[in-house]
Curated annotation (Swiss-Prot):
One of its GO terms (biological process) is proton motive force-driven plasma membrane ATP synthesis. Produces ATP from ADP in the presence of a proton gradient across the membrane. The gamma chain is believed to be important in regulating ATPase activity and the flow of protons through the CF(0) complex. It is found in: Cell inner membrane. The keyword Cell membrane applies. GO terms for molecular function: ATP binding; proton-transporting ATP synthase activity, rotational mechanism. It comes from Rickettsia africae (strain ESF-5). This is ATP synthase gamma chain. Belongs to the ATPase gamma chain family. InterPro entries: ATP_synth_F1_ATPase_gsu (IPR035968), ATP_synth_F1_gsu (IPR000131), RPE2 (IPR022436). It is a peripheral membrane protein.
Length: 323
């Protein structure tokens, strides 16, 4: 009888856990749908800013102010700034593992080359995984708020802008999971600075981009005699001529601010959508596993009950025959 009681208690416990995992699955699905909507709404803006920044690469760097040039050129013998985006909470499968593994591999490669490293970590899980081994490299750590927060973007942007303006870094790379669907998140390492030629989503087939600190060559600059640049119009095949000369002295500086902010925002949204997708899938698997376990436990319970009943019947029959 004690065995039956233990089985009933365990079935009750698994059913309780199943309710929790099912609820978490539904919550993550709702959050993921909301973030996907935010990504869709921001894609056009992010693409437009990225293409305008890419167009500036055709401008003679001498036409830019010294402060502006810092965002387009590599400063030798300075630190590689790595921004690592992970989750604040667990229960999301291998979401954090792929990011942390890639960051560790890249840090090892940079160390072998004798290069300096700075880390900005967003999310508790990434911080916990990296602090023991790389505490001396960690420049800043930010907790990931429960909802999308512009405050976080501004703080990270300020860290990047300050590091560039003070000539503390040679390049800036951001690590995040790019959302494809609920079951697939693609680990992406994307260069923010120095500003590189714009690439559309086709880069997703090979998301790990070669960078200066990882062996890429400093880009060449095509000189021209004024602050004009040509780029493709977003969503169209023809080109547009951007004239920055007559738009105010601070236009490019403002555009740089928008660009850095949009890149951080893009990575945060992609990371959040990927996290919720990974958590939804993990909780769905947990719910299904709980259901399978309940079926096995119920079968075991029924067999145990049948065995007890059979034993009791045999005892009754044996007793009646003895009489």
């Amino acid at each position: 009888m004690s065995n039956l009681k233990q089985l009933r208690t365990r079935i009750k416990s698994v059913k309780s856990t199943q309710k929790i995992t099912k609820a978490m699955q539904l919550v993550s699905a709702s959050k993921m749908a909301k973030i996907k909507s935010q990504i869709a709404n921001s894609n056009f803006y992010i693409e437009a800013v990225s293409k305008m920044m890419s167009a500036i690469l055709s401008i003679d760097m001498y036409e830019l102010s010294i402060e502006e040039q810092k965002f387009f050129n590599t400063v030798p013998n300075k630190a590689n700034l790595l921004i690592v985006m992970t989750s604040q909470r667990g229960l999301c499968g291998t979401f954090n593992y792929s990011i942390i593994k890639q960051v560790k591999n890249d840090i090892k490669e940079l160390e072998n080359k004798g290069e300096q490293i700075k880390l900005i970590i967003i999310g508790k899980k990434g911080y916990e995984a990296l602090k023991r081994q790389y505490v001396n490299y960690i420049d800043s750590y930010f907790e990931l708020p429960k909802i999308h927060d512009e405050n976080l973007m501004l703080q990270v942007k300020q860290k990047i802008m300050s590091a560039v303006e003070n000539l503390e870094i040679s390049n800036c790379v951001i690590y995040f999971n790019k959302f494809k669907n609920a079951m697939t998140q693609i680990m992406t390492r994307q260069q923010i600075l120095p500003v590189a030629k714009y690439q559309d989503d086709s880069m997703i087939d090979n998301p790990i981009v070669n960078l200066v600190g990882f062996g890429y060559k400093e880009r060449g600059v095509k000189p021209i005699n004024n602050r004009r640049a040509t780029s493709d119009i977003v969503g169209e095949s023809k080109s547009i001529d951007y004239n920055y000369e007559y738009e105010g002295a601070s236009l490019i500086s403002n555009l740089i601010n928008l660009y850095v902010n949009s890149q951080i925002n893009y990575a945060l949204l992609q990371s959040r959508a990927s996290e919720e997708g990974a958590r939804m899938t993990a909780m769905e698997n947990a719910t299904n596993n709980a259901n399978d376990l309940i079926s096995k436990l119920v079968l075991k319970l029924n067999r145990s009950r049948q065995a007890i009943i059979t034993t009791e019947l045999i005892e009754i029959i044996a007793g009646s025959e003895a009489v």
